[in-house]
Amino acid sequence: MITVERVDTTSKKDVERFVGIPFKLYAECPQWVPPLRADIRTMLNRDKHPFYEHSDADFFIARRDGEEVGRIGALENRRFNAYHDSHQAQFYLFECIHDHEVARALFNRVFEWARARGLNEVVGPKGFSPFDGYGIQVEGFEHRQMMMMMNYNYAFYPDLVEGLGFEKEVDFISTYIKLADFEVPERIHRVAERVKKRRNLTVHSFGSKLELRRWKGRIGAAYNRTFVDNWEYYPLTENEIDFAFSDLVLAANPKLIKVVLREGNIVGFILGFPDVSRGLQRANGSLLPLGLLHILLDMRRTKWISLNGVGIVPEFQGLGGNALLYSEMAKTVKGDLGFVHAELTQVAESAVQMRRDLINLGAKPYKNHRVYIRKI
C-alpha cells in the first residue's frame, strides 16, 4: 500500500527523513553529487529561506508498506506568477524509485495542493530561486553532476513524469569544452577591444572574497537587468540576492568572477566556479567533521571549471557585447589555474544565439535537463 504524508517542517525527524531519501536512492551512483544536508534543511525552513517572505511551499514523502520510496516539494512562487501573470505551481526535489504508482501518488498530492490554491498548471523541476538549477536530466547520464548547480537523476525519471501527462516546456543545455582544443578566434578578441573603446567599457576582476562581497548590490542589480527576457526570470528581492550571494561567495574563487563596467555600472558578468563535485561526494552531505576539508582541497586540485552565469544587459547584446563576453571567458578558463575541462552550465535553449556561438567556438552539448509542464 502506498501512502503520501505531508512533511511537518517544524519536526526535525520529518525533515531529516525528507532530506535523507536521495542519499539512499543514489548511494551506489558515481555520477550523483550529494547536496549539503544543511542546504536542503534551509529550503524547508520558513524562518530562514527568503522564498517564504513572498511565497509558499509544502513537502511530501511517499511510503510503501512503511518504507520511504519517494519525495516531492510543491511550490507557489507568487512573485514569479505576478511578474508573468501566470497561475503556476512548481515541483522540486522530486525523487522516486522506479515505480509509476509511487510517482503518480506523489504528483496527485501536488495537483491537489495546486488546485486548492487556484493554480492551473504544474511546472518543474524548478526550485526556490534561479540559482537552484532546472529540470529532469534527459541526456548525459554517464557524466557527473556539476556540484549543486543542476540535478542528477536516473534515466527512468523522464518516463515517470511523461507517463503522468507532463510535456516539455524548455530544455537547459550544458556544454563541454576541452580547453586544450578551445581557441577563440583572434577576430573576436579584436572586436572585443573595439567594443571596449567605443562604448567606454572596462573589465574588472576581483582580488578577494571581501572585495566581492562589497559588490553584492551592484551584481544583484545587474542580474535583475540582464535576464529580464529569460523564461525563468522574476525580479529577486534584496533578501533573495543577499541569500544567493552568500552561497556564491562561499563557492567562488574571486579570480574567476569578472564584471563588465560602464561608468561604474555593471553591464555584463562572467561567473566561474571551480568544480568541487569530488569534494562534495567525499563530504557526503556534511561539512563536519572532514567535509569542509575535502571541499577546500578539491577547490585547489580540481581540473574542472563551471561557467554558470554569463550575461550582458539587453542594450549591449548584438552590439559586440557577446564578443567581449567570449573573449573574457576564454581568458578566464585558460588562465593560470590549471583547468583542463570546462562546463557551461545550463544555458536555456531559448538563448539561441549564445548556444550557436558556443558550438561554433568548439563547445559540445553533453547534458540536457528538461523542465516539464502539465495543465491541471
Language-model segment annotations:
Residues 151-232:
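Acyltransferase donor/substrate-recognition loop-hinge adjacent to the catalytic core
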Residues 1-42, 111:
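TRNA-binding/sensing appendages of the translation machinery
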Residues 1, 177-180, 373-376:
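Short beta-strand-to-coil "C-cap" segments at the C-terminal boundary of structured domains/repeats
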Residues 22-64, 72-82, 211-311:
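A conserved beta-strand-loop-helix scaffold within acyl/acetyltransferase catalytic domains
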